[in-house]
Structure formats: C-alpha cells, structure tokens
Amino acid sequence: MSRVLVIGCGGVASVAIQKCCQADTVFTELCIASRTKEKCDALARKLEGKTKTVITTAKVDADDVNQLIQLINSYKPDLVMNIALPYQDLTIMDACLACGVNYMDTANYEPEDTDDPKWRAIYEKRCKEAGFSAYFDYSWQWAYRKKFEEAGLTALLGCGFDPGVTQAYCAYALKHEFDQIDTIDILDCNGGDHGYAFATNFNPEINLREVSAPGSYWENGHWVEIPPMAIKREYDFDQVGDKDMYLLHHEEIESLAQTIPGVKRIRFFMT
C-alpha cells in the first residue's frame, strides 16, 4: 500500500494518474495537486467508480517551496511524483528533502528564465566544459545526489518513456542480450493523427524549446553539436509507416553515456 502525491494535471500527468489508478492495490491513496485545482477535480470525477484508489485533490504553486512543504507535510505521502514542468524540478526536490519524502520526475531541470544572470553564468561554463548548449541537462539535479543519500531518500529522475523506458530497454539489452553495446539510436515516433497540421508530443513550450535547440550526440567519449534539426533521417516504423525524424539533444544520452560501459555513439531522433 502507498500514498502518493502527484504534482501536475496536464496531458502527461493525467495519463500517469490513470495508470496508477489501474494498479489500485499498489497506489491505494493518491492526491492530485496543481495550480489549477479545477483540473484535478475534473480528473478525480472522471475516475470515480473506476478504481479503488482513494483520490483527493489540492491546489499548489509548484514554484513556491513553502507551499509545497505545507502540502507534503499535510498529506504525508510516501512518494512525490513530479509531473509538472521541468522548471519546477528543483523547488519540488527541495521540498521533498525538507519533508523527508522520496521523489520522482519525468524530465530533467531547465530554467524558465534563460536570461537570469546567475543561471546564465553556470550555463555558459557548462557549455564550454561539456560541449553542448541545450538549456536542459542533468547537472543541476545530479548535484542533489549526496543530499538525498545522506537523508536516506530516493530520487528517481527521468521516469517517463523517453527518458525512462528507453534507458531500461538499453540496460536490459546489455544485461540479457549483448556482451557489449557500441551504438544506441533512440527513435521517438508519434504515430497519431488528429487532423491538424501540427501538434506537439507533450507540453508545447517544452517541446518547441527542445526542437529549436542545437542538436547533439555522444561519440567516442565527447559531445558533437550540430545546428537545430540539421540531421534528418527517414525510418519505416512498424504499424505506423515511413516518418521523417530529426536528431535532437535529449537527456537520456547523458545518463546512458555514463551507465553503458564502452558505448561509442548515442543518438536521439524524434519525428
């Protein structure tokens, strides 16, 4: 049995919440919290009679650490699932540390204000040292490792599909299928069609930031950076068909470069 606080009630969060409610023997109690409580209430009503999970809702501004601490201390969850925006990763991690609660998210931190002088100075130093210039990277959250270890807490980062399932596939392949993995290509395909000319795969602002950033990939121990969407490939996806896809920077490249010994190249493509 577990009590989980989910922060966020957008497209990704609503899917995750419904999946949790399907496993109601595991997720016995769930609190859905968002800046817009009405969205949380609407989802809770939609799930009435479809799950044994006890669902409550709350209003919270995830940019405000004090509000987060108050909510976490009030609800007393075993785990906080951060399925809000990546801008709020650090405030939610700080709140979890203050309250002694485990943490999980789906995407790594990036700042909302990329012109902030303090952040900019650290970012420009990282660009020179690491060799890629995307606004999002794991360095900010990996810096919390020691704090969580010393507190006896777990922080699981990037637990969506990509990042998330993609790394699990790679780890499984290395453990059970291969003695050595030299190259990894991750192909992210959206096969849906709602009749419109354009739609993002997730939060529009984050998705547009991602595709407009310089692309980068890992090769022979270092980053190679290219102009945005400069490398295009076509791939015949099973049950979907031919799709154009473009090389992007993506956070799981960072973690896979550290966790797959001897890997020579890692790339990420999105349709």
Question: Which ranges hold each PLM region?
Answer:
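Rossmann-fold NAD(P)-binding glycine/threonine-rich loop
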Residues: A107-L153
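Rossmann-fold cofactor-recognition segment
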Residues: G49-D64
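N-terminal Rossmann-fold NAD(P) dinucleotide-binding loop
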Residues: A13-S14
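Conserved Rossmann-fold cofactor-binding substructure of NAD(P)-dependent oxidoreductases
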Residues: D61-P77, Q88
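C-terminal catalytic/substrate-binding lobe primarily of soluble NAD(P)-dependent oxidoreductases
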Residues: K175-T271
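Glycine-rich Rossmann-fold phosphate-binding loop(s) that bind the pyrophosphate
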Residues: C9-G10
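Helix N-cap at the beta1-alpha1 junction of Rossmann-like dinucleotide-binding domains, i.e.
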Residues: T36-K39
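N-terminal Rossmann-like NAD(P) cofactor-binding module of classical short-chain dehydrogenase/reductase
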Residues: I72, D78-N82, Y103-D105
